[in-house]
Amino acid sequence: MKEERPIIALDFSSFEETKAFLDLFPAEEKLYVKIGMELYYAQGPDIVRYIKSLGHNVFLDLKLHDIPNTVRAAMAVLKELDIDMATVHAAGGVEMLKAAREGLGQGPTLIAVTQLTSTSEDQMRGDQNIQTSLLESVLHYSKGAAKAQLDGVVCSAQEVEAIKAVTPTGFNCLTPGIRPKGSNIGDQKRVMTPNQARRIGSDYIVVGRPITQAKDPVATYQAIKAEWAG
């Protein structure tokens, strides 16, 4: 599948900032937004309930990584928030991924984080003591996620084609680190433009600061959406 809307990363910590940003958009514009650790830990489940009450889709990106029983129970709780997508960390192993699927059920999309887009190959080898290539690590995690019946993975757009080649048809690739041409890449090491991500086969893209910190967030969002749609 291909989600037509870019997912907006709500890189805020307060309810007021979040509401002010969402209020910029007309009520009929239904967004797909990402709630990460900063916003969720600051505001808790109520921020999810508020955004869902506006009719937006919610991707809750908490990257759960714990023993299978704990992850299963946590996902069952998150399911009650009517989220549309959630993440777990692939490094937790296939049994943990299966437990996450059991807890969340078959409704929401469940994807696994492979290697963060802020991670370079040298960092992976030095910090994680993984001595394969970065791509081989990502493919290993992706195959584990597919085995556990997850819906896809978070990955760099540069890895999408290789992941699609080793996973079942319909396995989704969500790519963060998307930056419009000419924008600051921030702390991302592996980035692409929306157009490049579309052409290479990404199913979802996540864009944060280029939209949330833009002088005109609505116009910037619409431009990125148009570029993503092709």
Swiss-Prot record:
Hydrolase recorded as keyword: no
Protein name: Orotidine 5'-phosphate decarboxylase
Active-site residues from the entry: K63
Subunit: Homodimer.
Record SMART domains: OMPdecase (SM00934)
Any one annotated GO CC term: cytosol
Keywords attached to this entry: Decarboxylase, Lyase, Pyrimidine biosynthesis
Organism: Streptococcus pyogenes serotype M49 (strain NZ131)
PROSITE patterns cross-referenced by the UniProt entry: OMPDECASE
Domain of life: Bacteria
GO term, biological process aspect, one: 'de novo' pyrimidine nucleobase biosynthetic process
Family: Belongs to the OMP decarboxylase family. Type 1 subfamily.
Ribonucleoprotein recorded as keyword: no
Biological pathway: Pyrimidine metabolism; UMP biosynthesis via de novo pathway; UMP from orotate: step 2/2
GO molecular function, one term: orotidine-5'-phosphate decarboxylase activity
EC number(s) recorded for this UniProt protein: 4.1.1.23
Described purpose of this protein according to its UniProt entry: Catalyzes the decarboxylation of orotidine 5'-monophosphate (OMP) to uridine 5'-monophosphate (UMP).
Binding positions for substrate per the UniProt entry: 11, 34, 61-70, 117, 179, 188, 208-209
InterPro entries linked: Aldolase_TIM, OMPdecase, OMPdecase_AS, OMPdecase_bac, OMPdeCOase_dom, RibuloseP-bd_barrel
Entries under NCBIfam families matching the protein: PRK00230.1, pyrF
